Regions:
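Short, charged/polar N-terminal "headpieces" of proteins
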Residues: 1-6
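C-terminal charged interaction modules
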Residues: 44-72
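Charged/polar low-complexity intrinsically disordered segments, enriched in acidic residues
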Residues: 24-48
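A short, charged
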Residues: 8-30
Length: 72
């Protein structure tokens, strides 16, 4: 694997703690696709975990906009 995003929820501070890792040989196009796929998976999680269908749909719409602008 060339990249990983790891997130933890800090209940006390109500903030996300993150570790973003990627290899030096990961190309920028690969990173763009990785971001796009990560955002899409977050929309799925939003819908499945807490039933936010409309917001998940809005996030998917943004993902399509994101891909139109970034993934050419």
């Amino acid at each position: 694997s060339k990249a990983a995003f790891l997130s933890f929820w800090d209940l006390k501070t109500k903030e996300t703690l993150r570790i973003d890792l990627w290899t030096k040989d990961m190309e920028s196009d690969e990173m763009k696709h990785f971001f796009h796929q990560t955002l899409l998976s977050m929309s799925d999680t939003l819908e499945r975990a807490i039933g936010e269908e409309k917001m998940a749909g809005d996030l998917r719409d943004f993902c399509h906009h994101f891909s139109d602008k970034l993934l050419k």
